[in-house]
Amino acid sequence: MDNFLKQISSNVKKPIAELEDPDAVIKFHYMNISFNFPDLYYCNNNLFDKPENNLLDISKSLLMLNSFSHECFILQDILRVIRRYGHVYDVYFLPIGWLVGHGEAPKYHASIKLIRSNTQEIIDGIIRRQLSQYGIQGDNLSIFVDSSNEVAINRHSIIGARQLNPICVVSFYPFDPEHKVFFVIYVGRYKDKYCGISYVADREDMYKVINRIYPYVSCFYLVSDGIINFHTTPVANHTRNIKPLPVNYCNTLCEIVYDFEYLKFEQGVMSIPVFMPFVPKQFVSIINLPDDILITCTASSNIEYITHIDNKKLKRILIIIKDKFLKGTIMQGTFKKVNIIRHKKYTYTITYSSFDCPKLEDTKSSLPSTCNKAILDGRRYVTKTFNDTI
């Protein structure tokens, strides 16, 4: 989580107020929940390489996760449970490595690293019961608390503190990006560490939360997902009287995240530009798109993606996986396609496009029984998975 904070705050002018010595030290321990998915068969040995983990890398990892819908559902379910009892540090999944940071790869398909206090031992049994619903138990599950490695986090009192000039960074929340928004309020620093308080809120309440934080900060920094990049927009508070934060304490900024406290923050009013902290995405092959339906796509920086199908805006944009047939085509505009069996292969052809692209002259489809199959079992029943004809 430390790396994610650095990434979203890289273009931010942080407050320089030096805080008083901490009045308390909160102590936690790291806890690792590692497990295998019993029915997942996947290997990326000698291929996987992620030398860094910037915002585009994290976005790509979240895109990859959507290709593993069952495993992603289980991870999201466990993360929702964990947030009631601890603070998530990072998430590992074999196809993407660590989601927001770096570290040694565990010998399991997935791992969740969190911090918890010594009074939260109940989480062990809760996680075991939750994962057992998905058949994850026994040798497929390991829960380890590193009692030898204590995490000490400073707590600073800001009651009556003067000359504070807090700012707030708003971005997607990496452990639930489609439903949660992340708010990091920077208050000041203590020695070489920045201090503040971090909140999450439902995405649908994002503008309500911004309006409530506005009277207490000098500037918002809105981190927006531009699909091919991320950019940060500063929105200054031009009022002269910034209210003191309605909290008594802040802490060293880290993975400690709280649900937003609506009752503490008074309602404010500000003009907020429309922005998207995160744009949900998933991969798609042309062959899996509906036939004879108008499809709208756009292109930017060698990435082509679909925004509308049948003139209806999609909740997720679809990143097109192009094959050799469309290798030299820039897909920007509208098109229609139809799937056919040609030369014993299940393929597709473009029947209409507003942009230049190759089209097959003969669009007549052969009988399904003539199609080459990945599995030849002698049966007449023919269909396809996402990738193979069977």
UniProtKB/Swiss-Prot annotation:
Coiled coil: none annotated. Binds to the hairpin form of the viral telomeric sequence. Might direct genome encapsidation into the virus particle. The lineage of its organism: Viruses, Varidnaviria, Bamfordvirae, Nucleocytoviricota, Pokkesviricetes. This is Telomere-binding protein I6 homolog. It is found in: Virion. Belongs to the chordopoxvirinae I6 family. GO terms for cellular component: virion component. Keywords: DNA-binding, Virion. Disulfide bonds: none annotated. It holds the Pfam family Pox_I6_C. Its main location: virion. It comes from the Viruses. GO terms for biological process: viral process. One of its GO terms (molecular function) is DNA binding.
